[in-house]
Regions:
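Short amphipathic alpha-helix that is part of the acyltransferase structural core
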Residues: 1-60, 67-74, 140-181, 217-220
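An acidic- and aromatic-residue-enriched active-site/binding cleft used to recognize and process polar
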Residues: 61, 78, 114-117, 216
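Conserved acetyl-CoA-binding loop-helix of GNAT-fold acetyltransferases
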Residues: 77-80, 86-99, 124, 230-244
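Conserved GNAT acetyl-CoA-binding A-motif
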Residues: 94, 101-114, 244-257
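A generic, well-ordered mixed alpha/beta core segment in the N-terminal half of proteins
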Residues: 97-101, 106-112, 117-121, 125-129, ...
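Active-site/acyl-donor-binding loops of N-acyltransferases
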Residues: 125-144, 225-233, 237-346
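Amide-forming acyltransferase catalytic core, primarily the GNAT-like/NAT-type
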Residues: 129-232, 236, 241, 257, ...
């Protein structure tokens, strides 16, 4: 959304300056983001006085809901020049991106808030806490069964690594955001350049698993991202290798779901019918009649819905006993209890 006369090159240069002022990222990261993530198609921005003063990027993703694929969006880089804040600029961009996602057929939108202080701002536009995350201790006994694995650090992206990653995401129960080959390659490159580890485990000549590890040298903790659900020989071998490389460090794996308690990400339902259809397919035992109200941005989301036998139907008239739900209550219901694979790739 372009409201000024900057050339495309001037626009991107101004947007990069605004990004650096707001987020303090390194030049290397900014170069990577604007070369491999940013495009004019995902850009929402406002120009004033010959420069970009407010912006966000709405990145498209595919998402699995219990094995069924839907479209989703992720809001990245929401920022406003300090001189133009409290004028509703960022809010107008968020509202426009939400409306556009609905028109494109997206079921959900996501974002990672910079802190608890911005949650009230995003609630105005229908974003509510949906995903909590915690770092849980990993206990490594040193006993490995099921075969001997050779563990080596990956030094660059490989198609083998991507295939393992894609398979792990598709095997997860609950909700999972999927990442394209190019998105994953971007993350791998940035992860390695940032001094982090990607360990791979090989049984014989076959690479069977991987582990993303971020060392925190101040806390002396190794954080594991996107850990496999099972704790097999490959996992134990990689944990042992990581601890051998960083003796004396604790090791923790990030988890989401009912055991997690730290606010991590917010979700916005952009299509109630599709969201409830996905929920119904994942919960065939659910039998309920819901009246959804209060969505001022997407009024078509408001209405009467019946969830039964793994399906969702919509009624144009009030018939029967419906449970009234706000968008916030519906978001909590859909994401409560189910694990959401929403990992480091978006941080």
């Amino acid at each position: 959304m372009d409201n000024s006369k900057l050339t495309p090159g001037e626009h991107v240069a101004s947007l990069r300056r605004l990004w650096k002022e707001c987020f303090y990222d390194t030049d290397e990261f900014i170069d990577m983001y604007f070369t491999r993530v940013y495009s004019p198609q995902v850009d929402y921005s406002i120009e004033r006085g010959g420069r970009v003063v407010s912006a966000l990027q709405c990145l498209p993703y595919n998402m699995l809901c219990g094995g069924n694929a839907v479209l989703a969006g992720y809001l990245s880089g929401v920022c406003t020049d300090a001189s133009y804040r409290r004028q509703g600029l960022a809010g107008s961009l968020v509202a426009q991106s939400v409306a556009d996602m609905h028109r494109r057929g997206c079921t959900f939108a996501f974002l990672i808030p910079s802190g608890s202080e911005v949650l009230p701002f995003y609630r105005q536009y229908g974003f509510y806490i949906a995903i909590r995350r915690s770092a849980m201790p990993i206990r490594h006994s040193g006993n490995v069964t099921g075969g001997t694995c050779t563990v080596t650090p990956a030094t660059a992206y490989s198609d083998v690594l991507y295939r393992l990653f894609a398979r792990r995401q598709r095997e997860r129960r609950g909700y999972a955001l999927l990442h394209s080959r190019e998105q994953f390659k971007t993350v791998v490159d940035d992860w390695i350049k940032g001094g982090n580890l990607i360990l791979t485990a090989r049984l014989g000549k076959k690479t069977v698993s991987y582990l993303f590890v971020r060392p925190d040298n101040e806390k002396k903790v190794l954080y594991v991202y996107d850990a496999p659900a099972g704790r097999d020989a490959a996992f134990a071998s990689m944990v042992g290798q990581a601890q051998g490389m960083y003796p004396g460090y604790d090791m923790r794996a990030y988890i989401t779901g009912h055991r997690a308690h730290n606010t991590f990400a917010c979700a916005r339902i952009t299509d109630t019918s599709k969201a409830l259809a996905a929920y119904a397919a994942m919960h065939p035992e659910a039998d309920m009649q819901i009246s959804v109200s209060g969505d001022k941005l997407i009024e078509s989301n408001n209405g009467f819905y019946t969830v039964s036998h793994g399906q969702c139907t919509r009624s144009s008239a009030h018939a029967g006993s419906f449970t009234a739900m706000t968008l916030a209550q519906l978001t909590r219901m859909i994401f409560s209890g189910d694990k959401m694979s929403f990992n480091f790739l978006l941080e």
